[in-house]
Swiss-Prot record:
Record-given protein name: tRNA(Met) cytidine acetate ligase
Single biological process term from Gene Ontology: tRNA modification
Family annotation (InterPro entries): Rossmann-like_a/b/a_fold, tRNA(Met)_cyd_acetate_ligase
Organism name: Streptococcus pneumoniae (strain P1031)
A Pfam family per the record: HIGH_NTase1
Positions of ATP binding: 7-20, 96, 152, 175
GO cellular component, as recorded: cytoplasm
Entry's EC annotation: 6.3.4.-
Family named by the database record: Belongs to the TmcAL family.
Entry superkingdom: Bacteria
Reactions catalysed according to its record: cytidine(34) in elongator tRNA(Met) + acetate + ATP = N(4)-acetylcytidine(34) in elongator tRNA(Met) + AMP + diphosphate
Gene Ontology molecular function terms on file: ATP binding; ligase activity, forming carbon-nitrogen bonds; tRNA binding
Amino acid sequence: MTITGIIAEFNPFHNGHKYLLDQAEGLKIVAMSGNFMQRGEPAIVDKWTRAQMALENGADLVVELPFLVSVQAADFFGQGAVDILDRLGIDSLVFGTEEVLDYQKIADLYTEKGAEMEKFVKNLPDSLSYPQKTQAMWKEFAGLDFSGNTPNHVLALAYAKAVAGRNIKLHPIQRQGAGYHSVNKDVDFASATALRQHQKDQDFLERFMPSVALFEQASKVIWEDYFPLLRYQILSNPDLTTIYQVNQEMAVRIKEAIKTAQSVEELVELVTTKRYTKARVRRLLTYILVQARENVLPEAIHVLGFTEKGRQHLKSLKGQVNLVSRIGKEPWDAMTQKVDQIYQLGKPSIAEQNFGRVPIRIETN
């Protein structure tokens, strides 16, 4: 049987995600971000709600990406997620993208010339941002051009790099309907960005979200809910360079900007430069919010939920893969668990995220 992996945030889960799961074959394993997203923002609803949405709409098994995989630039995000899915035995990776190319060929190219390609990136001037360097590399070695707004394509290339040399086939699915950042309401498939923006528009949600009741019942947060905490962390920390990935230049800019910024968005605007993209600045602010430090990634994989089919697969992995289904006295990943406690501070109504929580079981699919 085919075992298909999907890397996702489901922030929130919408019809485009359901379409992706419908297109996937065999047993479907989702490696999903926890409570903070790749581009450095809190999830609109918590990881358990999002895992349940996925399980109700075609996923067989949902596992959690640790914080230091979730909140990373595309390459590290892709690498960390593929590592986890590889250990869970996937033989194909399905993903949505704006550009359907022969990503398999790109993965093979990276298998062959990876060292040379990384050397090329290293030698590019530091005035370029990391995404610009990566794009220059793909242009040079694969002849790829980038139109501005294709974050899923950028992630797809990161997945191609991550599967290089592994026995995993890539299956791109043409992204349906609205673009990633689109807030357009007159489309067949709305983007997660639009759903977050129109979260109080009942008709809109019902049109584009398969698990709308779950979403409506859940506590919802936005970055601004954490702004007072973020300000406190910045103002009270005498040396921001002790925080993961914060260098001297960024520390100075952030300390200066917090004097006048009245919101997270304003802070991001003030700190962003040509070299430091908004997404990168948001990630740094997330690291500061949670006091992130360089840390080893957990050995074990945290299971958020499964169907009967998913449970059978987990049974077959017993003894080969270290799985955690209940976080108790033994932590799974101390960093992620601390992050979840901070996530809960965004709204008093957010439930406990780890202790005593057991995987969600969906009986029928």
